[in-house]
A protein has these predicted regions:
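ABC ATPase NBD Q-loop/coupling interface
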Residues: 77-94, 154, 245
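Catalytic Walker B motif of ABC-type/P-loop ATPase nucleotide-binding domains
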Residues: 181-184
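Conserved ABC ATPase "signature" region
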Residues: 83-84, 130-150
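Conserved ABC ATPase signature
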Residues: 155-160, 164
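ABC ATPase "signature
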Residues: 239-240
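Conserved catalytic motifs of ABC-family nucleotide-binding domains
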Residues: 177
């Protein structure tokens, strides 16, 4: 218990934008997350890592209320700017706009490249074409896609490559001005060149946004993360400064995972 308190105290040296307290999640009888106390530092890249089935993706989904599905049950607190997002007064649509999500497999909407980026604004009532044009261009430029697609904005998003589709999904998330971007293994289905472009993009974005990436790839976490959360069997084993954890992990489980003794 004392070790857990010490780890959390060290973690709180970072300014958190998200944090959980005694977070528990069940899928039916399966207890997926167990008393999870974690922080996500503001405007940094946090990597959530751990072996398959440990609860990484469940934790990510808990951060913007994507667990509101049949059979799932959530207990505990998740705070965004000190507001419990699971309270009765919290608006899930506002939460999901401020805390965007990008999934493992690129999921472009069945519409044009332009309309994919403009979609969120239109849903929120924006009709001004000049404003939509500006937002579409600005966010396609942010993800390094504008020069590749500016002459075919009305083409189907499905005509893009896998890496381009994933960058388009990130642009769509950025268009509604989130503060946090959650990414669930966003490069696992991409080739090495596309993976490198996504990683470079996330580094550029981290100065303006809080980035949280779930990854099973330790080397990717080493390349990207400033802060690390290690999960094993639904529990937080270790969290803190990435450099410190990778150089001097306090838990034998963390050390074994980093060495590749299990995955």
């Amino acid at each position: 218990m004392q070790v857990k308190k010490t780890l959390l105290r060290r973690a709180l040296e970072y300014k958190p934008i998200l944090k959980s307290e005694k977070l528990n999640v069940w899928y039916g009888r399966v207890h997926a997350l167990k008393d999870v106390d974690v922080i996500i530092p503001s405007k940094r890249i946090t990597a959530i890592m751990g072996p398959s089935g440990c609860g990484k993706s469940t934790l990510l989904k808990a951060f913007n209320r994507l667990l509101e599905v049949e059979g799932a049950r959530v207990e505990g607190k998740v705070y965004f700017h000190d507001v419990d997002i699971y309270s009765d007064s919290a608006d899930p649509y506002t939460i999901r706009r401020k805390i965007g999500m990008v999934f493992q497999k690129p999921i472009p909407l069945p519409m044009s490249i332009y309309d994919n980026v403009a979609y969120g604004l239109r849903v929120n009532g924006v009709k001004d074409k000049r404003l939509l044009d500006e937002v579409v261009r600005e966010n396609l430029e942010k993800v390094g896609l504008w020069d590749e697609v500016k002459d075919r904005l009305r083409d189907s998003a499905f005509n893009l490559s896998g890496g381009q589709q994933q960058r388009l999904c990130i642009a769509r998330a950025l268009a509604v001005e989130p503060e946090v971007i959650l990414l669930d293994e966003p490069t696992s289905s991409l080739d090495p060149a596309s993976t490198k472009r996504i990683e470079e993009l996330l580094k550029r974005l981290s100065g303006d946004y809080t980035i949280v990436i779930v990854t099973h790839n330790v080397h990717q976490a080493m390349r990207l993360a400033e802060y690390v959360v290690f999960i094993f069997e639904g529990r937080i084993v270790e969290q803190g400064d990435a450099e410190e954890i990778f150089k001097n992990p306090r838990s034998i489980l963390t050390k074994a995972y980093i060495k590749g003794d299990f995955s």
